[in-house]
């Protein structure tokens, strides 16, 4: 019987099958942890006298609470927030006590958990991957089944290397056509969520297929899968291919020699079989897309960059009209208003959605030789120390600095308004991150989600700007 990519991975990881009364028990290949969602899990292990079942299949990094302030003269990244410092110390102690490898603050491998997994070669096709973070779906770009879990589940995986789960349904998200200049992977996923809604994927795993998806680089595929959760899905996946294998080859934790050949042979069996049936299929024509931007307080409130905010009369029901009214009151925007020309106070280039080297190259290519507008604060936060090192080797940091932007250390940063990486109350931020909820980037912050190209164009002009004028 033909099977989907999801079916193949799920079926090979079942420890105990799902029944009418009980969920399935799944084996977990890779467990990633960080300082925010793991402390209570370790407390539970100590309370029950349990060990970590597979410390060799567990990896920790510091990312959420880490300051991104440039290093001091001593080369140390200063941690001034007491709560952040306590979380970082606790993770360090927990990893030492339980024998878990840690990429600590200041180390050359530290970074956002969903950036370092792929760049180190830990993320591989066919794996089950979990982390106490909703954007674990990022790793699905490699043909892995990857999803976020809660703190109690973190404890369960630490103790057993297994997880209790109900089998989700499958949804094909087919994207055909070719992207036009100035339109990016970020615009694809924002368009999908805007068209189908933040609840479209509830109870499903997305598998992205089609000509436009196959043409994307691995880092672009990660951007797509990263925001699957914003579309309501449990996870997002893309079948592995030669692009995937070329990205993984030679990375520190990738298979070597004969093991590599065996791995690739297995990975080639994973793509969805001809004739396999998805529970649902939705489509998008990439050739018709323009740059996208959000206007409201959930990622589904998005419009083309040259569009207008919808009016209540255009919405299908009273609930949608009420949500629009509430969002626009928070954002201080009006129905029918265009966003082009809307004043911008902060631009954030970073997050697990868009902080990889290709994102920084894309932004720097537009910013080179230009200045950001007076009064705009632009924060550029690489996703990992490895990304930062590569960007500096290419001179990208100089381009950002000379334009007037801040070049910061690696971490989650302004995505969730940590430390001093916040958007002031009432101010507008064009952000390459994944969430625009009320207060997400700081109390009263007003977030407009967009691609790196749109973010940089807006930084240059000081207002929401169409990036297509800056690209060939």
Swiss-Prot record:
Cofactor: how and how many bound: Binds 1 [4Fe-4S] cluster per subunit.
Needed co-factor(s): [4Fe-4S] cluster
EC assignment: 4.2.1.33
Pathway in which the depicted protein is active: Amino-acid biosynthesis; L-leucine biosynthesis; L-leucine from 3-methyl-2-oxobutanoate: step 2/4
Binding site for [4Fe-4S] cluster: 352, 412, 415
GO terms for MF: 3-isopropylmalate dehydratase activity; 4 iron, 4 sulfur cluster binding; metal ion binding
Keyword Electron transport set for record: no
GO biological process, one term: L-leucine biosynthetic process
Name of one Pfam family that matches: Aconitase
Alphabetized SUPFAM superfamilies for the sequence: Aconitase iron-sulfur domain
Matching PANTHER family: 3-ISOPROPYLMALATE DEHYDRATASE, HOMOACONITASE, MITOCHONDRIAL-RELATED
Subunit and interaction comment: Heterodimer of LeuC and LeuD.
Name listed for the protein in its UniProt record: 3-isopropylmalate dehydratase large subunit
Species this protein is from: Roseiflexus castenholzii (strain DSM 13941 / HLO8)
């Amino acid at each position: 019987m033909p099977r989907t990519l999801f079916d193949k991975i799920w079926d090979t990881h079942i420890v105990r099958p799902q029944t009418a009364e009980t969920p399935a028990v799944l084996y977990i290949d890779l467990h990633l942890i960080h300082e925010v969602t793991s402390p209570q899990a370790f407390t539970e292990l100590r309370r029950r006298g349990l060990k970590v079942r597979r410390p060799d299949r567990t990896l920790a990094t510091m990312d959420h609470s880490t300051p991104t302030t440039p290093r001091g003269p001593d080369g140390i990244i200063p941690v001034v927030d007491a709560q952040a410092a306590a979380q970082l110390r606790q993770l360090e102690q927990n990893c030492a006590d339980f024998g878990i490898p840690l990429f600590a603050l200041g180390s050359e491998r530290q970074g956002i958990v969903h950036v370092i997994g792929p760049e180190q070669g830990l993320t591989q096709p066919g794996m089950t991957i979990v982390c106490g973070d909703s954007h674990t779906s990022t790793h699905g770009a490699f043909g892995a089944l990857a999803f976020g879990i809660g703190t109690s589940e973190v404890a369960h995986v630490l103790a057993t290397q297994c997880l209790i789960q109900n089998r989700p349904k499958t949804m094909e998200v087919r994207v055909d056509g070719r992207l036009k200049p100035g339109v990016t992977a970020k615009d694809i996923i924002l368009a999908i969520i805007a068209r189908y809604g933040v609840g479209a994927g509830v109870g499903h795993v997305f598998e992205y297929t089609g000509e436009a998806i196959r043409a994307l680089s691995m880092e672009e595929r990660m951007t797509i899968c990263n925001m699957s959760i914003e579309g309501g899905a449990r996870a997002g996946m893309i079948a592995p291919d030669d692009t995937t294998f070329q990205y993984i080859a030679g990375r520190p934790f990738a298979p070597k020699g004969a093991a590599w050949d065996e791995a690739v042979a297995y990975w080639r069996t994973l793509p969805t079989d001809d004739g396999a049936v998805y529970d649902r299929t939705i489509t998008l024509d990439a050739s018709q897309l323009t740059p996208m931007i959000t206007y409201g307080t959930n990622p589904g409130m998005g419009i083309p960059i040259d569009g207008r905010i919808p009016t209540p009369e255009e919405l299908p029901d009273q609930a949608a009209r009420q949500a629009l009214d509430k969002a626009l009151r928070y954002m201080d925007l009006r129905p029918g208003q265009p966003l082009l020309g809307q004043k911008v106070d902060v631009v954030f280039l970073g997050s697990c959605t868009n902080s990889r080297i290709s994102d920084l190259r894309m932004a720097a290519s537009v910013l080179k030789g230009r200045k950001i507008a007076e009064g705009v604060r632009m924060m550029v936060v690489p996703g990992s120390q490895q990304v930062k090192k590569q960007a500096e080797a290419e001179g990208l940091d100089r381009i950002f600095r000379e334009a007037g932007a801040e070049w910061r250390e690696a971490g989650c940063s302004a995505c969730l308004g940590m430390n001093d990486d916040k958007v002031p109350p009432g101010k507008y931020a064009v952000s390459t991150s994944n969430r625009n909820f009320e207060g997400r980037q700081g109390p009263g912050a007003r977030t407009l989600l967009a691609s790196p190209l749109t973010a940089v164009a807006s930084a240059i002009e000081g207002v929401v700007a169409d990036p297509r004028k800056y690209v060939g």
